[in-house]
Structures are given as structure tokens and as C-alpha cells.
């Protein structure tokens, strides 16, 4: 019952009998059934991909743990600066009486460039450059390009990480 609220309580004190009788009133509201996911984002995230992360099906009864699980799955990607997951207001019900879950996403900067210089007695001098691109394919992916130039060890590489690949909780990493 997502719309439960506490109504005013009533407390009766009987000084002669030394008793206190509190009466709590709670309005449970109606039973809430969930619709799909509505994504609010200015970024590149594919709304269908986000909907695939939802642990409920259309028509399932509202469970706050399932809504929190969707938020956790999005947080685990590490691609977003801000994530908000909430049940839509009562006035946004569908004709069937279902309520969508609203997901608002704020993307990180698409590109991050890192550079560094090192020196050690074992490897000598070196320069590192790393470029990371986030959410290039609209599914919270991370592409990392790395180059290292040093006296002894030089290398170039790329890593691609696709979180929740084909099903939630599974990440595909290619390098």
C-alpha cells in the first residue's frame, strides 16, 4: 500500500483508573499495481534497457523493495551522477489503474581524460593517458582506452564493460 498515511490519533487518559488508551488510525489507501518504467533523462540511455532492469512485471503489486532494487541496479553501473526512482503520483494512473515507476537519470560527463607521469628506479620514466567514455551505446556501458609509454614497458589497450548484459546482475567485460 504505497499511499498509506497516518490519520490523527486519539489518546484517552483515565486518571482515576491510571490508564492511557491510545488509538492510532492509519488509512492504507488503495492497493497499488505497477505499470512499466517511465525514464526522464536528457542523456543517451535507452528507456527499453532501463525497463528491462525492473524486477516486476506489469500488473504486479507494489513492493518498495523491488523499486529499491531497480535503483540499486542503476547505481551499480557507475555511469550516472544522479539517479531517482519513485512511484508516480496517484493522478498519473493508467486507464487500467496501474501506476508507472518514474526513473530520472543524470548522466556523468560522456568523456573523461586522465593523464599522468611516473618515474621509478625499476621502470624508468613513463607517461599514461586514459580516455573513458560513458554510455556510448545507451545501456550504461563504459569504454576505456589506455596508452602507456615508458622506458621499459609500453602498451596500448581498450576495455569495454556492458553491465546487466542480457539479464540483470551479469556484466560482460571485453579487453
Where are these regions (language model features)?
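Acidic, glycine-rich low-complexity/disordered segments
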Residues: 1-91, 109-112, 168
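Gram-negative/organellar outer-membrane beta-barrel architecture
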Residues: 63-175
Amino acid at each position: 500500500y504505497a499511499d498509506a498515511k497516518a490519520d490523527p490519533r486519539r489518546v484517552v487518559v483515565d486518571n482515576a483508573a491510571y490508564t492511557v488508551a491510545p488509538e492510532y488510525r492509519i488509512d492504507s489507501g488503495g492497493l497499488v499495481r505497477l505499470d512499466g518504467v517511465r525514464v526522464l533523462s536528457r542523456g543517451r540511455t535507452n528507456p527499453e534497457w532501463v525497463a528491462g532492469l525492473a524486477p516486476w512485471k506489469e500488473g504486479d503489486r507494489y513492493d518498495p523493495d523491488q523499486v529499491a532494487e531497480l535503483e540499486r541496479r542503476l547505481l551499480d553501473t557507475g555511469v550516472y551522477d544522479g539517479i531517482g526512482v519513485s512511484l508516480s503520483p496517484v493522478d498519473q494512473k493508467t486507464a487500467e489503474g496501474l501506476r508507472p515507476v518514474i526513473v530520472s537519470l543524470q548522466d556523468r560527463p560522456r568523456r573523461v581524460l586522465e593523464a599522468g607521469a611516473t618515474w621509478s628506479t625499476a621502470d624508468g620514466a613513463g607517461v599514461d593517458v586514459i580516455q573513458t567514455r560513458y554510455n556510448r551505446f545507451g545501456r550504461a556501458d563504459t569504454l576505456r582506452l589506455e596508452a602507456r609509454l615508458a622506458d621499459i614497458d609500453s602498451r596500448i589497450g581498450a576495455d569495454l564493460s556492458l553491465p546487466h548484459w542480457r539479464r540483470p546482475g551479469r556484466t560482460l567485460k571485453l579487453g
